[in-house]
Amino acid sequence: MSDGAAARRWGKCGHSCSRESIMVAFKGVWTQAFWKAVSAEFLATLIFVLLGVGSTINWGGSENPLPVDMVLISLCFGLSIATMVQCFGHISGGHINPAVTVAMVCTRKISIAKSVFYIIAQCLGAIIGAGILYLVTPPSVVGGLGVTTVHGNLTAGHGLLVELIITFQLVFTIFASCDSKRTDVTGSIALAIGFSVAIGHLFAINYTGASMNPARSFGPAVIMGNWANHWIYWVGPIMGAVLAGALYEYVFCPDVELKRRLKEAFSKAAQQTKGSYMEVEDNRSQVETEDLILKPGVVHVIDIDRGEEKKGKDSSGEVLSSV
């Protein structure tokens, strides 16, 4: 076959493979159930941001500000998210948080294509929710509209670490509460997640405003045009969420099927490695001493990857989650 023919064949194959990969990635996207789930994420995030951020408005105004009521804010955010999870969890999984969605992708709970639409819906919902709050709030008390900011005595690194920690405890709570392998969970999952959000606020409001949710910070920032240290509220929560999801799913409570597949893979690799060593020893016994002296640079490469790869079960089941 000529080089030109080979190139044309490879081009057709590459184009076909690429198109097929895209179709597989977006499988299930154009369904009614999918768009219901995306709409649920949009509406849930809108309501959550509207109610939660609304609790941060200081009605004393800038001239006579009232003391920050941490308990009020913490309970409002916690109860709001618990309510949204209870309402929309069975429709979309109740992520309501881009950090949670990214953690679900990293633990293979949802597809990348679905996560993209979820995050877009969450961000749009947060913007609309913050916009509605801005419209219904008197200009004299709107203040910063609940934009999350790092305390003046803290560095950006401190703020990043605080957001990582509080999001870690939230997402770990989500994975633990929604674990279908557990039989000891008898209470309300939504309430457990709500308590986790409230705890994070009680601890971190004075540090960073206690975001734990990139969309919650994104909506008010867009409306007010305040982007000071905004990257912290994306990087910190996403890092904490991915770390929590990975530790729970692959270290503390790994799936039985996943453990079995990993055990088989390691066992197969060990057998192949052992066989390659035996082959090297057999070849070495046939080499004459003079060959070793005359050809010191000869290297024998043994292919140990001839075993057929076994496809594992795709664990893409939805997980109830929040914030």
UniProtKB/Swiss-Prot annotation:
State which ranges are Extracellular (membrane side).
58-69, 137-155, 206-208, 223-231
One annotated GO molecular function:
water channel activity
Q: Which residues carry this modification: Phosphoserine?
A: S111, S180, S276, S285, S321
User: Residue numbers of motif NPA 1?
Assistant: 97-99
- Protein topology in the membrane: Multi-pass membrane protein
Q: Does the keyword Ribosomal protein apply?
A: no
Q: Which family does it belong to?
A: Belongs to the MIP/aquaporin (TC 1.A.8) family.
Q: In the UniProt entry, what is the domain comment?
A: Aquaporins contain two tandem repeats each containing three membrane-spanning domains and a pore-forming loop with the signature motif Asn-Pro-Ala (NPA).
Q: How does it assemble?
A: Homotetramer. The tetramers can form oligomeric arrays in membranes. The size of the oligomers differs between tissues and is smaller in skeletal muscle than in brain. Interaction between AQP4 oligomeric arrays in close-by cells can contribute to cell-cell adhesion. Part of a complex containing MLC1, TRPV4, HEPACAM and ATP1B1.
* NCBIfam families with a match to the protein in the record: MIP
Please report the name of this protein according to its UniProt entry. Aquaporin-4
